[in-house]
Design a protein with these regions (language model features):
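Ser/Thr/Pro/Gly-rich low-complexity linker/stalk segments immediately outside membranes or between
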Residues: 23-36
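Short strand-edge motifs at loop-to-beta-strand transitions and within beta-strands
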Residues: 74-76, 107, 139-143
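Short, structured beta-strand segments at or near domain termini in extracellular proteins/domains
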Residues: 88-91, 198, 220, 374-388
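GGW-centered surface loops in extracellular recognition modules
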Residues: 94-128, 212, 381
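Extracellular and analogous surface-interaction loops
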Residues: 101, 106-117, 143-151, 200-208, ...
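Secretome/extracellular-domain signature
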Residues: 135-258
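Extracellular low-complexity, Gly/Ser/Thr-rich intrinsically disordered linkers
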Residues: 291-387
Length: 389
């Protein structure tokens, strides 16, 4: 009859505790092939210390053996072990946090080990004239996903917008809408461009290139709309914030000259409009119609009149009609593979639905900060939360 044994393994020392008549007797294991140690799937001659690696699984060839790991004491408890049983311990040694700053190009991440990873993205800010008249802040999104070892995902970090008075304001990388200057008002009126979105996907490409591959998109953070500064009249406006299930509308400061850009949503892009009610200023020559409509992955650009650009996003925000600011782009956490997910945006509308959960925040930081809107360029971070078997 086989004896029922318990074994504790602490930093390479194996101790048998044999239970008989409620008395304990310690015996040291001499067989060197009973326990194997693997670090990053390579055989090792020693167990790494707690600060060197992360334990993630133990496999025994005898199904009757019960295995558990005590991370606090850094020890393994095996029950019902026999001398013929062989158990292998597996450890991961390497980075657990992976940061992706703005580079103006696509980046990739390859999972070093199978497990649950936390995805965090920050969209980019729209073009700012000053700290007082600033472009809309980029949104923040987070969620968790299960990735397999060596599985690769694509990361695109959005670039911030510009603010110009005598030339085109180029939209931020990854879809920010352009801002266009007003002839005759050079160095007086400044129009900002939209900030770019930041996204993580399983397919390579800028966000706008994934229109027919939406299932590949894991997470998105929208960029902010461009600001507007009007020196002669002191009628200036900040851009609409990006992020959340619906990007924030820009600000109207010149009544009678159209609307600011509306924010993008989960299904439609933002735009601005000139009609009998919004374009009723004397001598307003603008045609009554919709202007500056964004699209999937692109902030709006108004090619007809001087305007501020819309922020990029799952759906981009609209560019303004003339002398107003641009709208923010929307974020996205709707992929069913994503869990524990939420979006944050600056002073925005909230949602409690799981696939569009949005929380409004008054936090905005240059440094990428959890649950905070983003100033400047976007950012992305991937963190290994737990290792799978």
């Amino acid at each position: 009859m086989k004896q029922k044994l318990s074994i504790i393994l602490i930093l390479g020392l194996v101790i048998f505790i044999i239970v008989k008549n409620n008395n304990f007797r310690k015996t040291y294991l001499e067989e060197s092939d009973t326990v194997g140690v693997y670090i990053n799937n390579e055989l090792s001659d020693k167990i790494p210390s707690k600060d060197e690696a992360t334990f993630y699984k133990a496999i025994c060839d005898d199904k009757n053996v019960s295995v558990s790991w005590d991370n606090e004491s850094w020890g393994l408890l095996l029950k019902n072990l026999t001398k013929k049983a062989k158990c292998n311990l597996y450890f991961y040694q390497g980075d657990t946090v992976f940061n992706f700053d703005y580079t103006g190009s696509e980046q990739t991440f390859t999972a070093p080990v199978s497990g649950i990873y936390k995805l965090e993205t920050w969209g980019a800010q729209g073009g700012s004239y000053s700290n007082e008249y600033y472009g809309g802040y980029g949104g923040y999104s987070k969620g968790e996903i299960n990735l397999l070892e060596k599985q690769t995902v694509n990361i695109v970090v959005g670039g911030s917008g510009e603010s110009e008075s005598s030339k085109l304001s180029q939209g931020g990388y990854n879809g920010g809408g352009n801002g266009d200057y007003q002839r005759g008002f050079e160095d007086k009126r400044f129009f900002g461009s939209g900030g770019g979105a930041t996204h993580v996907s399983t397919k390579i490409g800028l966000l706008s290139e994934l229109t027919n591959y939406k299932n590949s998109i894991l997470i998105v953070s929208g960029g902010g709309g461009g600001s507007f500064y009007d020196g002669p009249n002191s009628t200036s406006a900040c851009g609409g914030a990006g992020g959340g299930f619906k990007g924030k509308e820009g600000f109207v400061t010149n009544n009678g000259w159209g609307t600011a850009g509306y924010g993008g949503t989960q299904n439609n892009a933002g735009y601005s409009i000139c009609d009998e009610n919004t374009c009723n200023a004397t001598n307003n020559p603008l045609e009554k119609k919709i202007y500056g409509e964004g699209s999937f992955g692109l902030g709006g650009t108004n090619a007809v009149s001087a305007s501020s650009g819309g922020g990029s996003g799952f759906y981009g925000g609209g560019a303004s009609v003339h002398v107003q600011s641009g709208g923010g782009g929307s974020s996205y956490i709707g992929n069913p593979l994503l869990t524990n997910k939420v979006m944050y945006c600056y002073n925005c509308e909230e949602s409690n639905e799981e696939s569009t959960k949005t929380i409004s925040t008054t936090c905005s930081e240059e440094t990428p900060t959890e649950n905070c809107a983003k100033k400047g360029n976007g950012y992305a971070r991937i963190t290994l939360v737990s290792i799978g078997e």
